[in-house]
């Protein structure tokens, strides 16, 4: 087995997306990089249906984040607490798509970000939240709020402020076009650092096997 795993851009805009060739109309590998002295690249991040572990891994790059902020400016992100998303060069999306709000946020990121990355297992394939896909949504709600052990004041929440759940949890490439996939539950801080620095530098992204294996 090779000790280096290359990540190439994805194709398509449906559930058939796979890491392979550059999609028509999308940036070529390295197109995000800007030669010469230019303004910092803008990066946005968000967490959909997940555990926030991928953002914790982003913070696990430790003191290297000081080097990262020399290269990029963070726009909307839980890290910055900026709520409104402006035009960005790079969007990192953690988590699967489980409710109507997730769909809205994800589509907003796709509209505003030149390059969109599925960050972590939940964004790539649905992850742990997608385990409910084996059951009907009604059965999940009943078990959680009505018939489960230790339930007090049973009843399925029906507040209009609560986003409506989708019947299934989807990986993000089933909703929007994705340019890169970075797997892991979560991907390590080292993997995120390698991915970001090579992408921002316009280099082919090659991650050592030690940064991606989970055996």
Which positions does each model-derived feature cover?
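Iron-sulfur-associated redox domains of electron-transfer enzymes in respiratory
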Residues: 2-15, 22-215
